[in-house]
Amino acid sequence: MDYYDIDSILSENQKVPCTSTVSIPGLGHEGRMVPTGSKVELPFWLAEVLAINSFVSIHMPAPFSSVVRNALKANPNSVSIRDITTHYYHFAEKMLHLISDDSLVQISLNTLRSRAMLIADASLNPQGALQQNSQFIEGLDDFEKHILRVSHNAHRSLINWQNSTS
């Protein structure tokens, strides 16, 4: 986790379903023991450490379920990623450090590629984009919103530079 990066902190606080492979003292409610085979949801930052040390096995969290994957495969531009999780790409990156899943890699890359075209279009004409694609813009996750802002600011800077050199 990047100590000062709020997006990293928020993405690592996403809950991840796990199954304990050993009894873990002090991890349960009010410091109780979690018995072997218990299903628990832990924040990613804790699940990662426990999984690396073989105390838990991690299962795929809801933002990467087969339902979400199928929706993203069918038409990534129609999915409101923000409703799934506000830090989809950061969370996917973190999960892929633990779980090898080529399908998730391809779906995430294809989703970003497809949505990047609409994001770029919206950054060039923000008023028109808000009128035509308000639902799409509202469904952007935080990384996509960052791309939208950076692209819009770069376009504005280019126009200002062109006007100043004329």
UniProtKB/Swiss-Prot annotation:
Q: Which Pfam families match?
A: PSF3_N (PF22466), Sld5 (PF05916)
Give yes or no: UniProt keyword Membrane: no
Name the UniProt record assigns to this protein: DNA replication complex GINS protein psf3
A GO BP annotation: mitotic DNA replication initiation
What subcellular compartments does it reside in?
Cytoplasm; Nucleus
Q: What is the protein's quaternary organization?
A: Component of the GINS complex which is a heterotetramer of sld5, psf1, psf2 and psf3.
GO CC field: chromatin; cytoplasm; GINS complex; nuclear replication fork; nucleus
Write out the similarity annotation: Belongs to the GINS3/PSF3 family.
The alphabetical list of record keywords is: Cytoplasm, DNA replication, Nucleus
Q: What does this protein do?
A: The GINS complex plays an essential role in the initiation of DNA replication.
Q: Does the keyword Aminoacyl-tRNA synthetase apply?
A: no
Q: Which Gene3D superfamilies match?
A: 1.20.58.2050
The domain of life is: Eukaryota
